[in-house]
Design a protein with these regions (language model features):
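Internal catalytic domains of large membrane-associated glycosyltransferases
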Residues: 141, 159-161, 171
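Feature of multi-pass inner-membrane transport and sensor proteins
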Residues: 155-156, 171, 202, 208-213, ...
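Peri-membrane helix termini and adjoining interfacial loops of integral membrane proteins
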Residues: 21-33, 105-117, 206-212, 254-265, ...
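Short glycine/proline-centered loop/turn elements that form peptide/ligand docking sites
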Residues: 154-157, 445-449
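Polytopic alpha-helical membrane proteins, predominantly small-molecule transporters/carriers
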Residues: 45, 166-167, 175
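The alpha-helix within a helix-turn-helix
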Residues: 162-163, 453
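Glycine-rich helix-loop "coupling/hinge" segments at transmembrane-helix boundaries
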Residues: 197-223, 261, 413, 491-518
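Membrane-water interface segments at the C-terminal ends of transmembrane alpha-helices
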Residues: 1-26, 39-152, 180-200, 228-247, ...
Length: 548
């Protein structure tokens, strides 16, 4: 019970810190807010709104199209595309931004060729359209994966029934497949939208005026804590609305699954239409372009940048000069910091997740304890949707207030001069990932196992440690892996809370790209992609296992 109470305080503190800043408004703060509403806030609202709207539509369109192609048709190469379409999940949008900025620069081969064909032609990828493009082609796998599962479970039989009734193919897709996949597409688009709102790397690198860049600028540049809290609370409100909408769509998905499951078991396996000739080529293009634009091309660009930088470094000596950041010792330090943060956060997250899930399973609590437990579970599930910059500000605001009231505590130094603050932010944001994995593992352990252990005289601690942990080791390993990878890729919380002179792969890649040193940023960026590939491979294997 003590762990549950501690977890409730830890998760709720950043949210309460942001909301509590509104109670500290004085006349100067109100005047500052009025000025912001007349100057910067409209720009934040317009840019963030357009980005959210277009990314949502783009992710639903691309994810839904490839899900229909993979789930409802047979064509040569389908098995390859079914897992290759997940590869962009390993590519953070800010890493993709570094690659395309170099590839599409004014002096590059692409714009040079286009200007040769069309004199006077020019464009700049570092703008709102470029950001929308990057987010769509790195985040569409969320919608693709959920829509593919929905269509594979229920769509094939309904499409076959519509075909036997003489419905044309186009009408079958529009009137059967798309309505069936709509809740899944909405849920996937909501997840992609949360990732978009939480992004700092793309917005900062492209110079966009979004809420995340506004939070960072208000805190780090203007030293305006009240403004940072106001921006963070506005973003938090938007995320809460998104969570409510996403939960509604998830309920509709479960309702559809219950209704459609009964009819799927009885009949023979439905025959999928086989595509050949021009239709097969079209299917290859539809499925191949997202993989090419969201993963293959950025990786090739980064490899070319790294190879070029490696050649230039070799001419002056691998350790030559203080300007060269490609020394092995520095790179090893960035990797060590990333893995150290990821390992510590993953270890604590699985302990908290196991404690929370075991308490929910064991029951036997008072009414107040049960209410607290449900509240903690709801807060933990909300944590992943909260942007890292919002969590960082929510941590720093109470710390700054406590430091002013109680200077001898040195709490600010403890959180910002050590790894404690950044690990805390990771736990608030990513404990939800561990909880979901452990909950899924507990569904495979019958309650009768616990009853038998209690009959034999085992205590709660013995049941959890000696019985559940061995049975849950796969789920615990998956939870640790997911948290570890998310920590390695996390940028805004790390930028705000990391100890002085402690750079991770994400931070150093951002700093080098910001200084237009893209060749030097390529190796850290590729390392992040390589780490991100691990959970994607796990998902691919799980899908193949379930299919078989």
């Amino acid at each position: 019970m003590h762990i549950i109470g501690l977890l409730a305080v830890l998760i709720a503190l950043p949210i309460l810190g942001i909301l509590g800043a509104w109670f500290g408004l004085d006349a100067a703060g109100i005047d500052s807010l009025r000025q912001q509403m007349q100057t910067v806030l409209p720009g934040y609202l317009v840019t963030s709104g357009w980005l959210a709207l277009m990314v949502t539509l783009g992710v639903a369109l691309v994810g839904g199209t490839v899900a229909v192609a993979i789930s409802l048709f047979e064509f040569r190469g389908k098995r390859f595309f079914s897992w290759a379409l997940l590869l962009p999940m390993a590519m953070p949008a800010y890493v993709c931004a570094y690659a395309y900025t170099d590839f599409l620069q004014y002096a590059g081969i692409v714009q040079g060729t286009l200007r040769g064909w069309f004199p006077g032609f020019r464009f700049d990828v570092r703008g709102l359209p470029g950001a929308i493009f990057l987010f769509v082609f790195t985040l569409y796998p969320y919608a693709y994966l959920l829509a593919r599962n929905a269509l594979s479970e229920r769509g094939t039989h309904l499409m076959e029934a519509a075909r036997m009734l003489g419905t044309p193919l186009r009408e079958r897709i529009v009137r059967v497949a798309l309505p069936l996949a709509r809740p899944a597409l909405m849920a996937g688009a909501a997840l992609a939208l949360m990732e978009t709102l939480a992004d700092y790397g793309v917005s900062a690198y492209f110079g966009l005026t979004t809420f995340t860049t506004g939070i960072y600028k208000a805190w780090m540049v203007l030293d305006d804590r009240i403004a940072a809290a106001q921006y963070a609370s506005a973003l938090l409100l938007f995320v809460a609305v998104l969570l409510w909408l996403e939960r509604r769509e998830q309920q509709r998905m479960r309702f559809s699954s219950v209704r459609g499951h009964r009819g799927d078991d009885g009949g023979a396996e439905a025959r999928l239409p086989v595509l050949g000739g021009g239709r097969a080529v079209l299917a290859w293009l539809v499925c191949g372009l997202p993989v090419l634009l969201g993963f293959v091309l950025p990786v090739l660009i980064l490899l070319q940048l790294w190879w070029g930088e490696l050649g230039r470094t070799a001419q002056t000596g691998f350790e030559g000069g203080s300007a060269s950041l490609f020394s092995f010792s520095r790179y090893a330090g960035w990797v060590w910091n990333s893995f150290r943060f990821g390992g510590m956060a993953a270890l604590v997250a699985i302990v908290l997740a196991l404690s929370l899930c075991f308490a929910q399973r064991a029951g036997g609590m008072s009414r107040v304890s049960g209410w607290l437990l449900r509240g903690v579970a709801r807060l933990a599930s909300m944590g992943y949707a909260i942007p890292g910059s919002v969590i960082a500000v929510g941590i720093l605001l109470p710390v700054a207030w406590l430091q002013a009231v109680w200077p001898a505590a040195s709490l600010g130094i403890l959180l910002t001069a050590t790894s404690l603050g950044v690990i805390y932010a990771y736990l608030v944001r990513f404990t939800a990932v561990a909880v979901q994995s452990v909950e899924a593992g507990y569904t495979r352990i019958p309650a009768s196992v616990d009853e038998a252990a209690r009959t034999l005289g085992s205590s709660r601690g013995a049941i959890a440690w000696r019985l559940h942990v061995p049975l849950l080791w796969r789920s615990l390993a998956t939870a640790a892996l997911m948290v570890f990878v998310d920590v390695v890729k996390e940028l805004p919380a790390t930028l705000l809370l990391r100890p002085f002179d402690t750079d991770t792969l994400a931070v150093i890649a951002h700093n080098l790209a910001r200084d237009e040193r893209l060749g030097e940023a390529a190796l850290p960026a590729l390392s992040i992609v390589a780490v991100g590939l691990v959970p994607v491979l796990v998902v691919m294997r799980a899908l193949d296992t379930r299919k078989n």
